[in-house]
Amino acid sequence: MAKKSKIAKAKRQEKLVQQYAVKRAALKAKGDYIGLSKLPRDSSPVRLHHRDVLDGRPHAYMRKFGMSRLNFRELAHKGQIPGVRKASW
């Protein structure tokens, strides 16, 4: 489980990215790099880091499922992820 402050910071960053997305795209299209540098640092989508939706874990994130490998394994064993089966060959 990630610290609550880190999860809150990630949510705040996501809001900032959405808030400034249009303005950032317009400045990029114009080539106004001075204007881009005046935008908040956290409004850049490059600074976002994927986090597990269940517990906020930042490492071993699986994009396809939106969760870390630990939670994926646990839910897959319980049969709670549709379309995921244990491999046998």
UniProtKB/Swiss-Prot annotation:
SUPFAM superfamilies: Glucocorticoid receptor-like (DNA-binding domain)
Any one GO molecular-function label of the UniProt entry: structural constituent of ribosome
Role: Binds 16S rRNA, required for the assembly of 30S particles and may also be responsible for determining the conformation of the 16S rRNA at the A site.
One Pfam family of this chain: Ribosomal_S14
GO terms for biological process, alphabetical: translation
Source superkingdom: Bacteria
InterPro entries, per database record: Ribosomal_uS14, Ribosomal_uS14_bac/plastid, Ribosomal_uS14_sf
Keyword Ribonucleoprotein belongs to the record: yes
Matching PANTHER family: 30S RIBOSOMAL PROTEIN S14, SMALL RIBOSOMAL SUBUNIT PROTEIN US14M
Extent of the signal sequence: none
Keywords: Ribonucleoprotein, Ribosomal protein, RNA-binding, rRNA-binding
Keyword hit for Transport: no
Gene Ontology cellular-component terms listed: cytoplasm; small ribosomal subunit
Organism: Lacticaseibacillus paracasei (strain ATCC 334 / BCRC 17002 / CCUG 31169 / CIP 107868 / KCTC 3260 / NRRL B-441)
Name of the protein in question: Small ribosomal subunit protein uS14A
Family: Belongs to the universal ribosomal protein uS14 family.
Assembly, per entry: Part of the 30S ribosomal subunit. Contacts proteins S3 and S10.
Matching HAMAP family: Ribosomal_uS14_1
Gene name in the database record: rpsN
